[in-house]
Amino acid sequence: MFGCSRGACRGAVGRGLQMGWERSKSAVRGAIARHRRSAIVGTMHRAAAFFVSAWHNEGGDFANNGERAVLQRLTPADLRLAIDVGANVGDWARGALQCWPNCRVHAFEVAPRTQEALVAAFLSSPVRGRIEFHALGLSDLPGDRTMYYFPDHDKLTCDTPRHEGLAAVPFEAHLTTLDAFCGERGIEAIDFLKIDVEGAEHRVLKGARGLLEADRIACIQFEYGAFSIQTRFLLKDYFELLSERFVIGKIFPDHVAFGGYDWTTEDFRFSNYVCVLKERPDLQRMLRG
């Protein structure tokens, strides 16, 4: 009746609706941009930003961001040795020892005041006999380096006074590599390596090259975020360093989203990733959720 087949007509209608939708989106974008200084649009933006941040699981809330859940889901694996680099006051180490009853933890904390608080936190703990404290840092090369402690924010210890407006206390830190440490201790394999060192995670991994190339580390957790801008070691670089041997995924409260690298994930939002040896599909299944 109208000079076209039913399928062709449906296609034309669909294309028309799509074009209309695109024009509508363009109009809405323009309206938002023109009124971006208004109170209503500002409130909507803050609400949307909060939603997006939550959707990306941004933040370091150990109890709720999925880090504790990772430990719990790995309980059946009966892990025996974990390395906690950047232990702070021991939240992760305590969680690992509680979830893995046969595991020992080596906890590294380079800041002297934080190291004291870490040791004190375990003095009367029932898991005290399974944790060993090390007042030194791990990096890509051994030696001494000036680092900075922030008394009001002890989790921010790093090798540069990057946080403007915060009091920074310089101190001399002794560093070694994970390869050297394990060689000295006769440690042949690591079940779980957790790294949270304010943007220097890649240095720790480079100092473990021997262990990595020998497939001696089953799982790795590292933090990624805005400090990658300063270090210029991007999420892309972590995938290039690790993806030959590991499957890599972002940690969420109820699952790990394993997958390949995509430039849209290079968002510099503070979050945690976990890597599992490709030859350990059992651990991968536990974590997928």
Question: What feature does the model see in each segment?
Answer:
Residues 2-289:
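Phosphate/nucleotide-binding beta-alpha loop and adjacent structural elements of enzyme active sites
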